[in-house]
Amino acid sequence: MMQKPTNSKGYNVEHTEYIEASPEVIWKTISMPENLNRCHPFCKKNTMIKWEKEKSIDLIEYENGLKLKRHFTKWFEGKGYELLIGKSGTASAQVLWDIESKYDQISALSIQLEIYPEVILKKYPKIFHFFILNWYVIPKMKDYLQSVILGFKQYIESGKTVSKNEFGVNLMFSNP
């Protein structure tokens, strides 16, 4: 089971988009196994290991070859879920997906990411973590979250599968 790092300060990044759909329709999409294959612009392959609500585990291989495992830890039926993502036993980040009804057939989909720099930047001297995090990682992760949610928005509203880099390239996860 993947664990959060101990004694690690997390940094939050979040993005929200309005989607022309009910929370039930959004939930059906975000809670189906291997959904990233249809909706994620940087996902080369999303493979389910097991799909059992808060015990779900899957793998994501990004377009640039990076492979991460997702361990779901909380499941809020019809509302969202929480997961840990990383390469091995220690998570690189904690992720919260949340659906909120706004108006008739308009809902908000949010993804909140808590990044653990001691894990993702461990190959760099600690003195550089602040600069790398604030000038590279956080801006790239903001773009990443926007692209991911736009992918789900497109799939939910039109039924059209998202293509590679559909909303722009992100060098942390894809190749041009």
Where are the language model's segments positioned?
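Generic structural detector for well-ordered beta-strands
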Residues: T16-E20, H71, D98
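Short hydrophobic/aromatic-rich motifs at helix boundaries and adjacent loops
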Residues: N7, E17, H40-F42, K67-R70, ...
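Glycine-rich portal/gate segments that line the openings of hydrophobic small-molecule binding cavities
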Residues: N37, T47-Q94, D104-A108, D143-V162, ...
